[in-house]
């Protein structure tokens, strides 16, 4: 099996590839489209959709929101890329880039890691702060404009490390997990080979503000 995206074929180093998933197609399992990114130092990570059941469900009915945009964070650059998949699903269009400096300024966080659509916005966790330390946490983007809305937490408590997260909407509860700060997880330009994430020991539980 050859990789569908070869490093030598990427003009800038980062790209999103589209693979044919129709078993009846002659190109099944092969790369059929590609969108190159302007920069190549992002370390693209767990991307997600702008809308999902959490936004369309009875708790938060937004029937006219289209599930068409991919929101793609970069743990190294702290950039956030937004791609429109509707016009040409084989070659999504890059319609917005939020620079890492804007993420730092408006949220106080760095190294965005995972995206989940929520009832009142797009939730994104970050591993830490712009200086490579902590605490990490969660910030939000607008579903329609993708403008940064700031931090989600109102009262952090002892939580310091951040990784992934999900919720029980009916109970207004979120569970987060731990990993490491940008310096210790390799998501910072100042990371050293001797820095390693500490083993996670807790899964903080939150009451939605």
Enumerate the language-model features and the residues they cover.
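Short, conserved, GDST-rich strand-edge loop motifs in beta-rich repeat architectures
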Residues: 1-10, 57-68, 72-73, 125-135, ...
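Acidic and/or Ser/Thr-rich intrinsically disordered tails and linkers
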Residues: 1-3, 9-11, 27, 40-55
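Residue-level signal for glycine
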Residues: 13, 26-31, 88-95, 146, ...
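Beta-propeller blade signature
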Residues: 14-21, 135-146, 192-209
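A short helix->beta-strand "capping" segment at the edge of beta-propeller domains
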Residues: 20-44, 94-101
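Structural signature of eukaryotic scaffold interfaces centered on beta-propeller domains
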Residues: 43-66, 108-119, 165-172
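Asp-box/WD-like beta-propeller blade repeats and closely related beta-sheet repeat scaffolds
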Residues: 85-169
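Beta-propeller domains
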Residues: 155-162, 166-209
């Amino acid at each position: 099996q050859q990789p569908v995206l070869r490093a030598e074929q990427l003009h800038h180093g980062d790209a999103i590839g589209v693979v044919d998933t129709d078993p009846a197609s002659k190109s099944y399992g092969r790369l059929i489209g590609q969108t190159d990114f302007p920069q190549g130092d992002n370390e693209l990570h767990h991307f997600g959709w702008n809308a999902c059941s959490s936004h369309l469900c009875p708790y938060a009915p937004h029937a006219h929101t289209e599930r068409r945009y991919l929101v793609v964070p970069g743990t190294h650059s702290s950039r956030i890329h937004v791609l429109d998949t509707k016009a040409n699903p084989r070659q999504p269009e890059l319609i917005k880039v939020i620079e890492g400096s804007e993420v730092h300024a408006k949220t106080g966080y760095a190294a965005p890691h995972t995206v989940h659509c929520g009832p009142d916005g797009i939730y994104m966790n970050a591993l830490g702060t712009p200086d490579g330390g902590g605490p990490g946490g969660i910030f939000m983007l607008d579903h329609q404009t993708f403008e940064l809305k700031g931090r989600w937490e109102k009262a952090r408590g002892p939580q310091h490390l951040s990784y992934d997260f999900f919720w029980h909407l009916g109970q207004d509860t979120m569970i987060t997990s731990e990993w490491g700060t940008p310096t210790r997880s390799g998501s910072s330009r100042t990371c050293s080979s001797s820095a390693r994430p500490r083993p996670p020991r807790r899964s903080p539980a939150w009451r939605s503000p």
